[in-house]
């Protein structure tokens, strides 16, 4: 993802809406990718706890959504070094034909030192 998205008007509006909803204790409806963009923003700014809260909010609305589950899987492998948890996230992805599903699965294989398996998989 390009950092430029964080400077877009749409992103700033979505971030503001999300933060206002959290402050007021209300819910907000965004698309899975929009929630994930907000989570990436928080993670980039060193706030992993809030990033994961955003992802949980997304998954409460869209339980099988690719983008939030892929984000959660990446955090599992890159931050927590937990391949099993990452694979659990990937297993919950509803659209097994989404390219991101294939990419995150291969990334997990690579982190798990199964590079040849990842090459065959892709």
Residue ranges, per PLM feature:
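Residue at a conserved register position within TPR or TPR-like alpha-solenoid repeats
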Residues: 41-42, 76-77, 109
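Short coil turns that delineate tetratricopeptide repeat
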Residues: 63, 95-98
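Structural motif corresponding to the intra-repeat A-B loop/turn of tetratricopeptide repeats
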Residues: 45, 79-80, 112
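Canonical positions in the second alpha-helix
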Residues: 58, 89-93
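TPR-repeat structural position
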Residues: 48, 82-83, 115
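Structural register within alpha-helical repeat arrays
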Residues: 37-38, 72-74, 105
């Amino acid at each position: 993802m390009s950092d430029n998205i964080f400077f877009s008007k749409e992103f700033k509006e979505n971030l503001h809406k999300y933060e206002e909803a959290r402050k007021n204790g209300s819910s907000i409806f965004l698309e899975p990718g929009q929630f994930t963009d907000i989570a990436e923003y928080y993670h980039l700014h060193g706030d992993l706890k809030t990033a994961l809260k955003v992802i949980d909010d997304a998954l409460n609305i869209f339980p099988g959504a690719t983008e939030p589950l892929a984000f959660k899987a990446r955090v599992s492998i890159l931050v927590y070094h937990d391949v099993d948890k990452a694979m659990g996230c990937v297993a919950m992805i509803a659209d097994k034909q989404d390219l991101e599903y294939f990419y995150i699965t291969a990334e997990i294989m690579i982190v798990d030192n199964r590079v040849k398996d990842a090459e065959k998989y892709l």
